From Swiss-Prot:
<dbReference type="GO" id="GO:0004553">
    <property type="term" value="F:hydrolase activity, hydrolyzing O-glycosyl compounds"/>
</dbReference>
<dbReference type="GO" id="GO:0009277">
    <property type="term" value="C:fungal-type cell wall"/>
</dbReference>
<feature type="region of interest" description="Disordered">
    <location>
        <begin position="29"/>
        <end position="67"/>
    </location>
</feature>
<dbReference type="GO" id="GO:0016020">
    <property type="term" value="C:membrane"/>
</dbReference>
<dbReference type="InterPro" id="IPR000757">
    <property type="entry name" value="GH16"/>
</dbReference>
<keyword id="KW-0378">Hydrolase</keyword>
<feature type="active site" description="Proton donor">
    <location>
        <position position="242"/>
    </location>
</feature>
<keyword id="KW-0812">Transmembrane</keyword>
<dbReference type="InterPro" id="IPR013320">
    <property type="entry name" value="ConA-like_dom_sf"/>
</dbReference>
<feature type="active site" description="Nucleophile">
    <location>
        <position position="237"/>
    </location>
</feature>
<feature type="domain" description="GH16">
    <location>
        <begin position="122"/>
        <end position="387"/>
    </location>
</feature>
<feature type="region of interest" description="Disordered">
    <location>
        <begin position="1"/>
        <end position="20"/>
    </location>
</feature>
<comment type="similarity">
    <text>Belongs to the glycosyl hydrolase 16 family.</text>
</comment>
<keyword id="KW-0326">Glycosidase</keyword>
<dbReference type="GO" id="GO:0071966">
    <property type="term" value="P:fungal-type cell wall polysaccharide metabolic process"/>
</dbReference>
<protein>
    <recommendedName>
        <fullName>Probable glycosidase C21B10.07</fullName>
        <ecNumber>3.2.1.-</ecNumber>
    </recommendedName>
</protein>
<keyword id="KW-0472">Membrane</keyword>
């Protein structure tokens, strides 16, 4: 081992001292201190940013991984269950289509049925008729009972029996004419004497032909030629000739039990329908029945009488009930010859087909009636005043006999045909 070199030791000592001095300046120099601090902060910030970027990258990577997993799951589902989804969709489509087809079918059936009902109409085929009963001349009254009863329509009237009617001069008959009238000579406080006749014979179906020269007319009057079944209204009622006060148009009306309607159906007729429910107790009907008014020709009242009257016809069969009126100058030759053929006539005034009314159920065997009442349920009250008639109906009828000289029936004949 040799002796240490003193020069080398001095250099070593100097370098150590210089280093120590530099370190001291770095530590205690404020400027260098701030610079160093900033460098530290910058380095720390850069580290945080790098860490944040790394976090975002990791998050994006995680999201991508999740999306890829979801996509892979859906793809797997599509690959694993395509038949199930298609099967389910086709079943759903089939069910919806089936429901729609059923609904369309039901709706079409309902509408089709309504249309079929609305358009359906009886053929009213031609019949060969034979005369079964004729009321005329001096034997006319022998076929009727005189109904000495209280008026069921609450009229201001006294219905007399046959003997009383004859004594008071209310009835008469010869080979050409049959007269039935109300008293037109005296005042009455309990009702004006009049007539109500009902046939002794029942009829079921047939052609009823009334040749009428004159019908009762004037304020307060309510005449009617009609048919009536037992157990009213279930047996039915057919008003062939009817009007009140100073009216000018005849009305043909059916009165029935529940279940006979003429609404929304095909009807072939020239008259005007007034009501469509024939049930006497239909809401707000007040026993109006289902009436048809004859708007043309002098079918009622003063004009009818001045025109020499005319012929009223009722055709009653299972398919329906129809009615005609012919002016005196327009009576078909087959009627006057005694061989009526309704199939050859013009359209009826009234048509009541069996579309919504079982004719044979609603109308039992019928009797024929003629009557003449006053005021009552129809001709009186507001109807009387609205016709322009004076005072109250009962007072006028009871105290003005001279106003009832036109209140009479003049009948040429009534014939009943059946097939």
């Amino acid at each position: 081992m040799g002796i240490p070199d003193s020069t080398t030791d001095s250099r070593h000592s100097l370098s150590s001292a210089a280093l120590s001095s530099a370190s001291f300046e770095n530590i205690y120099d404020p400027a260098r201190k701030n610079e160093s601090t900033n460098d530290v902060i910058d380095n720390h910030t850069d580290t945080e940013i790098d860490d944040h970027d790394n976090d975002h990258e990791n998050l994006d990577s995680n999201n991508n991984n999740e999306n890829n997993e979801a996509f892979n799951e859906k793809a797997a589902e599509k690959k694993l269950l395509p038949w199930y989804r298609r099967y389910f969709i086709w079943i759903l489509i089939f069910i919806v289509a089936l429901i729609c087809s059923v609904l369309i079918g039901v709706l079409g059936g309902v509408l089709g049925h309504r249309t079929a009902v609305r358009d359906r109409h009886p053929s009213y085929k031609a019949k060969t008729y034979s005369l079964v009963k004729e009321y005329k001349g001096t034997t006319f009254f022998d076929g009727f009972d005189f109904m000495n009863i209280t008026d069921p329509t609450h009229g201001f009237v006294q219905y007399l029996d046959r003997n009383s009617s004859a004594k008071l001069g209310l009835i008469s008959a010869n080979s050409s004419n049959v007269i039935m009238a109300a008293d037109s000579k005296h005042n009455y406080s309990s009702g004006r004497p009049s007539i109500r006749l009902q046939s002794t014979q029942y009829f079921e179906h047939g052609l009823f032909i009334l040749d009428l020269i004159h019908l009762p007319y004037g304020c307060g009057t309510w005449p009617a030629f009609w048919t009536l079944g037992d157990d009213w209204p279930n047996g039915g009622e057919i008003d062939i000739v009817e009007g009140v006060n100073v009216g000018t148009s005849n009305q043909v009306t059916l009165h029935t039990g529940d279940g006979c309607e003429m609404e929304d159906i095909k009807r072939v007729m020239t008259g005007t329908a007034l009501q469509t429910n024939c049930w006497v107790d239909a809401p707000n009907s007040y026993n109006a029945g289902c009436g048809v008014e004859n708007p043309s020709g002098p079918s009622y009242g003063e004009a009818f009488n001045k025109n020499g009257g005319g012929v009223f016809v009722l055709d009653w069969r299972s398919e329906g009930i129809r009615s005609w009126f012919f002016n005196r100058s327009e009576i078909p030759s087959d009627i006057t010859s005694g061989s009526p053929q309704p199939a050859k006539w013009s359209e009826p005034v009234a048509d009541f087909p069996d579309t919504k009314c079982d004719i044979d159920k609603m109308f039992s065997k019928q009797k024929i009636l003629f009557d003449l009442t006053f005021c009552g349920d129809w001709a009186g009250s507001s109807v009387y005043s609205s016709a322009g008639c004076p005072g109250s109906c009962n007072d006028f009828v009871g105290n003005n006999p001279h106003n009832f000289t036109e209140a009479y029936w003049n009948i040429k004949s009534l014939a009943v045909y059946q097939y």
